């Protein structure tokens, strides 16, 4: 049987079919949406879901446990240093060594004739001849080291006062030298045996027992004392003072040692002294009396001392002043040499013996570097009247024609005058 459909029926069926199809599609879409969009709001279910998610995150991000024997983690790369960071740290500038200087002053022969003591006894009632040196006290005090050659042995009054040719001075002389401020006293000279061995022993003992701060050099009681390098220290600078004599007027055997001018001994001592001190000064009694110019032997000995490293040479014995020169040693070193300082004080009877030389030297040390940085040649005059009275030493700068007119020297030497002395000063002073 066949079914016949008219147009109206077909149209209704078609519309119903479309509605059913649209409903089916919408149902599928809604079912596929998340719960939140589907209106799911149950609180317990939301919290459970959140806790589950948090636990999952913790499991993924938890750091693995490390053990002590595992390899260390590599350091993270650092930023390259900036230009400022690569500059070296500023350092403190090196401190310059401080220069230390000391001044030395040296006088010639302290030649004490008996008349000087007799006059002082008559005026003052004792042998303490302080007034003879009163005018040079400031000169002595101005130096860090003051040196004098004690030409006459200080054997003490018990051995008696003696004049030329065998001198002896009372202990008061040592007292005065200490009072003036002398630091170094040289004793090796041709008059050292004038009072025999006992005179030498007395002199050594008196200085040692009363003035141990004074360096006595040139004579010794034992070989052990002789073996020690005599050194005087001022402001941390050490100066060795070696003292020798060409000979002596008389000799007496005994337990004393006098330094003789033996070249082997001198050079060996200089070498040892250079190891022990900063500077080496050789005080040598040499030359010819009353000779105004050094002789060839003095020149040769001075050059030898320079070759072995002496820094300063101070000569005595001629009783008159001689030249000052600077020598060059074999190693290129410099040596300052005063060939003769003449007399500090005396009652000799010639004009040149009344003028004494004064060595003025500056030693400087900067770290290990050492040098003589300044030197000069000054002068003093021994003043006394016709009776040898009022004997005193006067600095040349204070000497006047009036003082020269009062001097007793014209009674013995008619050439004496202020102008004569001035001519000698002009000849030898450093230009």
Name each model-derived stretch:
Residues 2-3, 11-40, 49-51, 55-56, ...:
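Acidic, metal/ion-coordinating pockets
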Residues 65-84:
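Extracytoplasmic/periplasmic/luminal assembly and interaction segments
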Residues 60:
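Glycine-rich, pocket-lining loop/helix-strand segments that form or immediately flank
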């Amino acid at each position: 049987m066949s079914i016949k459909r008219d147009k109206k029926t077909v149209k209704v069926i078609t519309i119903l079919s479309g509605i059913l199809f649209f409903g089916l599609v919408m149902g599928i879409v809604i079912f596929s949406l998340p719960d939140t969009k589907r209106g799911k709001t149950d609180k317990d279910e939301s919290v459970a879901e959140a806790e589950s998610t948090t636990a999952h995150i913790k499991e993924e991000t938890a750091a693995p446990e490390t053990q002590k024997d595992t390899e260390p983690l590599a350091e993270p790369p650092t930023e390259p240093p900036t230009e400022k960071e690569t500059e070296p740290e500023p350092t403190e500038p090196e401190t310059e060594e401080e220069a230390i200087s000391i001044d030395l002053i040296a006088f010639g022969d302290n030649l004490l004739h008996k008349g000087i003591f007799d006059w002082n006894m008559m005026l003052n009632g004792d042998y303490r001849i302080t007034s003879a040196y009163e005018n040079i006290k400031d000169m002595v005090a101005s130096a860090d080291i003051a040196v004098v050659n004690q030409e006459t042995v200080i054997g003490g009054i018990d051995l008696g006062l003696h004049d030329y040719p065998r001198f002896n001075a009372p202990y008061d002389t040592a007292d005065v030298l200490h009072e003036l401020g002398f630091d170094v006293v040289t004793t090796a000279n041709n008059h050292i045996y004038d009072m025999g061995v006992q005179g030498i022993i007395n002199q050594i003992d008196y200085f040692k027992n009363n003035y141990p701060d004074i360096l006595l050099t040139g004579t010794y009681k034992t070989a052990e004392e002789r073996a020690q390098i005599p050194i005087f220290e001022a402001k941390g600078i050490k100066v060795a003072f070696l003292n020798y004599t060409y000979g002596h007027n008389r000799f007496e055997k005994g337990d004393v040692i006098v330094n003789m001018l033996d070249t082997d001994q001198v050079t060996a001592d200089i070498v040892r002294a250079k190891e022990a001190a900063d500077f080496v000064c050789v005080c040598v009694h040499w030359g010819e009396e009353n000779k105004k110019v050094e002789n060839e032997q003095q020149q040769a000995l001075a050059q030898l001392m320079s070759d072995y490293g002496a820094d300063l040479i101070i000569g005595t014995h001629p009783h008159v002043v001689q030249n000052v020169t600077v020598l060059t040693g074999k190693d290129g070193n410099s040596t300052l040499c005063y060939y003769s300082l003449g007399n500090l004080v005396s009652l000799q009877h010639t004009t040149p013996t009344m003028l004494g030389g004064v060595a003025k030297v500056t030693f400087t040390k900067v770290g290990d570097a050492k040098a003589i940085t300044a030197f000069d040649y000054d002068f003093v005059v021994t003043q006394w009247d016709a009776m040898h009275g009022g004997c005193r030493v006067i600095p040349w700068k204070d000497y006047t024609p009036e003082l020269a007119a009062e001097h007793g020297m014209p009674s013995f030497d008619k050439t004496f005058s202020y102008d004569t002395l001035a001519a000698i000063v002009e000849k030898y002073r450093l230009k």
